[in-house]
Amino acid sequence: MSKTSNKSSADSKNDAKAEDIVNGENQIATNESQSSDSAAVSERVVEPKTTVQKKFRIESDLLGELQIPSHAYYGVHTLRAVDNFQISRTTINHVPDFIRGMVQVKKAAALANRRLHTLPAQKAEAIVWACDQILIEERCMDQFPIDVFQGGAGTSLNMNTNEVVANLALEFLGHEKGEYHILHPMDDVNMSQSTNDSYPTGFRLGIYAGLQTLIAEIDELQVAFRHKGNEFVDIIKMGRTQLQDAVPMSLGEEFRAFAHNLAEEQTVLREAANRLLEVNLGATAIGTGVNTPAGYRHQVVAALSEVTGLELKSARDLIEATSDTGAYVHAHSAIKRAAMKLSKICNDLRLLSSGPRAGLNEINLPPRQAGSSIMPAKVNPVIPEVVNQVCFKVFGNDLTVTMAAEAGQLQLNVMEPVIGESLFQSLRILGNAAKTLREKCVVGITANADVCRAYVDNSIGIITYLNPFLGHDIGDQIGKEAAETGRPVRELILEKKLMDEKTLEAVLSKENLMHPMFRGRLYLEN
């Protein structure tokens, strides 16, 4: 880039401030990324023409010059964003699926531009190599130091991606970082693109990948519940509605219902993920495809399908697709729904394990830590509790996504970054919560079969099974007397000679209580 000789004092101050910010950000990134990425980088670096080590390089943009750390693969636009958006201190470095999605877009664009002869072969080869360094070798995953909250509809991340890919490509060509007259972040890496089509497409790919991870975690969790259902299949217990005794069931049925609940959510999440495979790549600024060569729209989507292995398709109306964020609302709604089901299951686990002496105590959750600083021997259901809290956070994120989607204006929704922050966070924490619940709770659950059976034997709810023999009114009277006197239903029925003992025992047998079809056969025989 060309240097400005008469830099103002204001620019000098900005340089100093940016330098401080970058030094701090890079120290954080270095500490977090550990040594594996650094080793991979050192092994694959192509020696540049100049080997003299400098602490900084100078890059300039519309606003002037900035000093960029010489080791950094990002450039001046990224540094501006780091300075401007010090909001959450959570950076794109922590969202690898998003980084990969953006880089996949850059690779597909290079392939399409080469096939249409708008990008020279050598540049295309260098860009593709650079993208593969990130996608396959996982290099430079720590070179995205911008905050997840950012203005500009994602321009900062798009610029960041362009710069990292460009500087890696320059390395491939044997040039120094920042020698953009050889290969330019915008003119070459961003060729035939706008932030307004590359960013949402990369976003969709990242969310799609995150959904696959969440679906896999939910699948493992539902399998764990199913195994417990099989383990508890012969344990009879009372079912409850409105926290009152209802009719008997098996503990296995209760746990299999948890599994079926989660399996249903997998289907919903897959459908939501598939909606993300319609992209607006080729739309550029507002959907008209300005500055793209003829045929680019279909070429680039085909190339992106090759790069990702996904069946992507171009949106029917690119202007509509560029401004619409409905697919994100739908995706997060599916995530919220899964969180709602998971939270309800955790509520049930906490209730069923309550006690142990003054609660239901039908199941035992694995003890994970001491529960009180003042009450000895107390153990709390900390795993279901933390999952509940994660689900509440997902519910809040869903409202954020809804409000941000509604806030779009005319041909673009500039609020996509906060939609992305909410979606990626929900995917990450809900997936972690599902894994935690499975590993630290569900697989270790045991049943208190005697407690479960005692509740059934002492229940008034079993009177429901006698309706075909006694009628509802007599059942009411027996149930009321049992509640008032504390006497068992069986005893009152026999005392009043309302049924013979053989029939009563058959109807109230464990077989019939767990499989009520038996009662139907008995009724027909009579």
Swiss-Prot record:
Residues 1-44 are annotated as: Disordered. GO terms for cellular component: cytosol. Signal peptide: none annotated. It comes from the Bacteria. Residues 10-20 have a biased composition (Basic and acidic residues). InterPro entries: ApsA (IPR004708), Aspartate_Ammonia-Lyase (IPR051546), Fumarase/histidase_N (IPR024083), Fumarase_C_C (IPR018951), Fumarate_lyase_CS (IPR020557), Fumarate_lyase_fam (IPR000362), Fumarate_lyase_N (IPR022761), L-Aspartase-like (IPR008948). Residues 371-380 are annotated as: SS loop. Pfam families: FumaraseC_C, Lyase_1. It is an enzyme of class 4 (lyase). It catalyses: L-aspartate = fumarate + NH4(+). GO terms for molecular function: aspartate ammonia-lyase activity. CDD domains: Aspartase. L-aspartate binds at T155, S194, T195, N196, T241, S373, K378. Residues 24-39 have a biased composition (Polar residues). The active site is at S372. Keywords: Lyase. Its EC number is 4.3.1.1. GO terms for biological process: aspartate metabolic process; tricarboxylic acid cycle. NCBIfam families: aspA, PRK12273.1. Belongs to the class-II fumarase/aspartase family. Aspartase subfamily. Homotetramer. Catalyzes the reversible conversion of L-aspartate to fumarate and ammonia. This is Aspartate ammonia-lyase. The gene is aspA.
